[in-house]
Amino acid sequence: MNSIEFPLFDRTTQNSVISTTLNDLSNWSRLSSLWPLLYGTSCCFIEFASLIGSRFDFDRYGLVPRSSPRQADLILTAGTVTMKMAPSLVRLYEQMPEPKYVIAMGACTITGGMFSTDSYSTVRGVDKLIPVDVYLPGCPPKPEAIIDAITKLRKKISREIYPDRTMSQRENRCFTTNHKFQVGHSIHTGNYDQGFLYQPTSTSEIPPETFFKYKSSVSSPELVN
């Protein structure tokens, strides 16, 4: 399925000597050693969890899930990304070593999904935060579609030139390194009347006759039982 035609093996001489470049050699070595950082926030991640089983066996592609961004070169975002989670996602992406890749999985990750119309806290597309290499639509995508997306990413890596990639990432970044988000006008300010919602009662406000009335109504046999 989606066989990868790598140019490294096309330039062979009559003496069976492979002539290639260092860039092509590094791309070839990364094809079967993608270590993903799983960033699952919603139901789309359940479909990706099916790949771990023996039916699909994503280990055959060299995928080794990592829990640390410093050991991963692929981050797979699956699910809804909220405004509160956006800085942490950008921080995880920046902690990953170069070269690094991103797969946006699911409609909620790509466009905000069903939350994009009336939700005040949903990011309308993860590509507004980090650059995306492969878009995987669906609600949710099937495991076969995830395998196809990984294969397409491997094809992209095989034809990649690293200096061109870093230059395009710098030009297409939507936020600066400091990630200072512009806070717009809020529909609801949230300034509630705290005195109306919460009125703590102290023991000094309870009349003495009320206190002794309820205390005398409880008999000793009831306390024993």
UniProtKB/Swiss-Prot annotation:
GO cellular component, one term: chloroplast thylakoid membrane
Keyword match NADP: yes
Entry keywords, A to Z: 4Fe-4S, Chloroplast, Iron, Iron-sulfur, Membrane, Metal-binding, NAD, NADP, Plastid, Plastoquinone, Quinone, Thylakoid, Translocase, Transport
Topology of the protein relative to the lipid bilayer: Peripheral membrane protein
Pfam family, one: Oxidored_q6
Binding site for [4Fe-4S] cluster: C43, C44, C108, C139
Cofactor: [4Fe-4S] cluster
Location in or out of the cell: Plastid, Chloroplast thylakoid membrane
Cofactor: how bound: Binds 1 [4Fe-4S] cluster.
Statement: the UniProt record of this protein carries the keyword Cell wall biogenesis/degradation: no
Main location: plastid
EC primary class: translocase
InterPro entries in UniProt: NADH_UbQ_OxRdtase-like_20kDa, NADH_UQ_OxRdtase_20Kd_su
PROSITE patterns associated with the record: COMPLEX1_20K
Annotated transmembrane regions: none
Signal peptide: none
Catalytic reaction annotation: a plastoquinone + NADH + (n+1) H(+)(in) = a plastoquinol + NAD(+) + n H(+)(out); a plastoquinone + NADPH + (n+1) H(+)(in) = a plastoquinol + NADP(+) + n H(+)(out)
HAMAP family: NDH1_NuoB
Oligomeric and partner information: NDH is composed of at least 16 different subunits, 5 of which are encoded in the nucleus.
Matching PANTHER family: NADH DEHYDROGENASE (PTHR11995), NADH DEHYDROGENASE [UBIQUINONE] IRON-SULFUR PROTEIN 7, MITOCHONDRIAL (PTHR11995:SF14)
Protein name: NAD(P)H-quinone oxidoreductase subunit K, chloroplastic
Organism lineage string: Eukaryota, Viridiplantae, Streptophyta, Embryophyta, Tracheophyta
